[in-house]
Swiss-Prot record:
Molecular function GO labels: dihydroorotate dehydrogenase (quinone) activity
Protein name: Dihydroorotate dehydrogenase (quinone)
Keywords annotated in UniProt: Cell membrane, Flavoprotein, FMN, Membrane, Oxidoreductase, Pyrimidine biosynthesis
Cross-referenced PROSITE patterns: DHODEHASE_1
UniProt-annotated binding residues for FMN: A61, G62, L63, D64, K65, T85, N138, N171, K216, T244, G267, G296, Y317, S318
UniProt remark on cofactor binding: Binds 1 FMN per subunit.
Gene expressing this chain: pyrD
One GO BP annotation of this record: 'de novo' UMP biosynthetic process
Membrane topology: Peripheral membrane protein
Naturally occurring in which organism (per UniProt): Pseudomonas putida (strain GB-1)
Family the UniProt entry places it in: Belongs to the dihydroorotate dehydrogenase family. Type 2 subfamily.
Magnesium in keyword set: no
Location within or outside the cell: Cell membrane
Length: 341
């Protein structure tokens, strides 16, 4: 059924198709239809960050930026749902067109620019949802906030989403907000992580619970840079790392229609690069922090490869656009079939 739906949706512009799909998934969730229409994955519970996941395959941030379809996505069989990226204030994002399909490569290029309705609106949607599973909320900075004051935006969002989230992801790796990726390195990263850790401890006392913090990083880093990030995450007391966001690279898509568009490339072409980052992180972290792997999972076996590389959980987005809910089941089945260590 999804194959037919995709054929129809792919006749529309990518962003129109995205918005319509989100509306349909949200409506199906409100009516309780998605679970009946989609075969559910096998149960494969796992505990990570002190949280209990129904299965290790989650929805990556970016597909549901405003929390419009939380129940709908959960009913499709995801083991966890991550919404956002959300910013303190609403913002329109970059000018259109800003989303491009590369079907020959099972890939997408986007330069959305954190378009969202703001953190207050997102919280309204979270409160309206019935979903009681693991919910991640991905936070970022507004476009017009100077990078020197980015910490302020992250702390505003952290304060607001703290009690609503199962875990909180700090997005310092989108290539579509100028200067954002500089926060992954050196003193900028240390200052951000220290500020987040200090505020989180204050919030934990106030609210009587410690919400895990995950940092989402880019795939476009050297092994040495990745090692430095891993050390900083451990030193600051972060709880997980999400590897990875989209890539600025264009290997394998340069000659394709839209292959030269500016923005972040996701989907199949980022698989090897992203999985390499997971392997490097696993070696550096030595099991002290869990890794949530995202990037290039378009077949079930890719999810198993991420777990074999050292990840505890995986997330999908572009693969879901191309393959639909069946990819969730395939990924869960592939992970379940892995030899027990």
């Amino acid at each position: 059924m999804y194959t037919l739906a995709r054929q129809l949706l792919f006749k529309l512009s990518p962003e129109t198709s995205h918005d319509l799909s989100l509306d349909l998934i949200g409506a199906g969730g409100r009516l309780g239809l998605n679970g009946m229409l989609c075969k559910q994955p096998a149960a494969l519970p796992v505990s990570v960050m002190g949280l209990n996941f129904a299965n290790p395959v989650g929805l990556a941030a970016g597909l549901d930026k405003n929390g419009a379809a939380i129940d709908g996505f959960a009913q499709l069989g995801f083991g966890f749902v991550e919404i956002g990226t959300v910013t303190p204030r609403p913002q329109p994002g970059n000018p259109k067109p800003r989303l491009f399909r590369l079907p020959e490569a099972t890939a997408i290029i986007n330069r959305m620019g954190f378009n969202n309705l703001g953190v207050d609106h997102l919280l309204e949607r979270v409160r309206a949802a019935r979903y009681n599973g693991v919910l991640g909320i991905n936070i970022g900075k507004n476009f017009d906030t100077p990078v020197e004051r980015a910490v302020d935006d992250y702390l505003i969002c952290l304060d607001k989403v703290y009690t609503a989230a199962s875990y909180i992801t700090v997005n310092v790796s989108s290539p579509n907000t100028p200067g954002l990726r500089s926060l992954q390195f050196g003193d900028s990263l240390k200052q951000l992580l220290d500020a987040l850790a200090e505020r989180r401890e204050q919030l934990a006392v106030t609210h009587g619970k410690r919400v895990p913090l995950a940092i989402k990083i880019a795939p476009d880093m050297s092994d040495e840079e990745t090692a430095l990030v891993a050390a900083a995450l451990m030193a600051s007391g972060m709880d997980a790392v999400i590897a990875t966001n989209t890539t600025l690279g264009r290997e394998g898509v340069e000659a394709l229609p839209h292959g030269g568009e500016a923005g972040g490339l996701s989907g199949a072409p980022v698989l090897a690069k992203s999985t390499h980052i997971v392997k490097v992180l696993a070696g550096e972290l030595g099991g002290k922090l869990p890794i949530i792997a995202a990037g290039g999972i378009t077949e079930g076996r890719h999810a198993a490869e991420k777990i074999a590389a050292g990840a505890s959980l995986v997330q999908i987005y572009s693969g879901f656009i191309y393959k639909g809910p069946a990819l969730i089941r395939e990924a869960v089945d592939a992970i379940a079939a892995m030899p027990r260590v």
